[in-house]
Structures are given as structure tokens and as C-alpha cells.
Amino acid sequence: MSASAVNVDPAELGKFAAHAARWWDAGGAARPLHDLNPVRVQWIAARVALRGARVLDAGCGGGLLSEALAARGARVTGIDLTPQLIEVAKLHLHESGLDVDYRVQGAEDLARAEPEAFDVACCLELIEHVPDPAALLRALADLLRPGGALVLSTLNRTPRAFVGAILGAESLLRLLPRGTHRYARFMRPSELAAMLRDAGMQLVELAGLGYEPLSRRAWVSRRVDINYLALARKPG
């Protein structure tokens, strides 16, 4: 399938493909994801039943979240449109001994092939990288069984998020490669809630994600003005 046939920005794929080889290096370009991952997984596990559940990790990258969910007993399918990252994710399974079904595939394509196949869908740090986030959310809703849960994380479109995620993380501290984020694609919670409603889902919980890059400490907070987590439910 060509890039034009799916909800993808080729420039975004190129950014992440360039760092595929060091995805599992906790001191590399994916360092913030390594630091945030345990906190995010704990937040997810406190809200949805993972053991035995069929879980989708959309935009799985090199598999950080997928493996953590599989370690908690979930039956995980990880999808990403960057072949280099899927290859890294598959190779890392030889080290971890975990079982994850990795595929080079987009959510829209998977929704056509396997509608209502998942109990839980996770979409972390992806929605701000696609050209049509509403289409992505509709596909994720279609992939969920009635009563299923959707977990998202993204960046709020606020001055504080611009300073922290772009000026700070990319330009000053160089924690992320320059150009990783585009401020115009950051999403306010109210915008996310509206898109979820249009997709037939309901936003039920928001939480902020705090991160101190120098100490590499991450935590859940009440402030959602930079990075935030969201839980939505499909009726049923």
C-alpha cells in the first residue's frame, strides 16, 4: 500500500526511521519514551484489565509499550508504518522472550480487516504526527469491541507545551531531534473530546504527565498543559 493511501506523513516516518537502530538505547533519541513508559503503563494497568485482553498498540515504534503490556499478560498486536522500527521491535523479542504480533500496517487498514477485534487500543505519542487525527480516531473506535477502552497520550497546544516540548526538549536540551514535533499538530483536550464524540466514543478521564529531563523523573499529575493521558470508552 502506498503512503498516499494511508493516514501518514512520509516526513514523519523518516524522522523515526532515522533513529530505529537506537530505539532500545535508554540514552538515545528515544530517551524520554524510556523515562515515561513505566508511568504510562502503570496508569493504563490501573484502568483496564490487561491479562488475557487483546490489546492494540497503534504507532508501536520499536516496541517499548508493546513489550511492557505483554509482560502484564496482554495479547498484544503492535502496528507501525515504519518498517525499520517494526524490524527493531521484532528483533528485541529475541532478548525479552515476550510474544507480540508486530505488523507494518496502519490503523485504518487494520480496521477494515479486523473490525471490533480488540478489547483495548493504545495510541501514545502518535496522534500529533498524523495528518488526519480524526480519521485515526475513527479507525481506532472501529477496532474496539463494544465497551472497549482507548488510551491516548499527546501534547496540549499551549505556550507551555511549546516551550517545554519544542524549545526545551529539542532546541536547548537536545533530548529529541530538532523537528520531532510540530506545534500546529498539538491538540487541546477539548478538541480531542470532540473528535472522540464524532468517532462514537466518550472521553472519561484526563491526566497530566510530568517529566523532569535532567533527573529523568516522570509522574502523573493534574496539570494537562503539556503532555497528557486520556481514557475513552466505546459504548456497549
Which residue ranges define each predicted feature?
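N-terminal, positively charged/glycine-rich alpha-helical extensions of SAM-dependent methyltransferases
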Residues: 1-24
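Conserved alpha-helix/loop element of class I SAM-dependent methyltransferases that forms part
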Residues: 34-51
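Conserved class I S-adenosyl-L-methionine
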Residues: 53-59, 151-173
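Class I SAM-dependent methyltransferase SAM/SAH-binding core
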Residues: 62-109
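A short acidic, Gly/Pro-enriched loop at the edge of an enzyme's catalytic core
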Residues: 111-120
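A short glycine-rich, Lys/Arg-flanked "PGG" loop and its adjoining helix->strand segment in the class I
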Residues: 134-149
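Acceptor-substrate binding/catalytic loop of class I
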Residues: 174-191
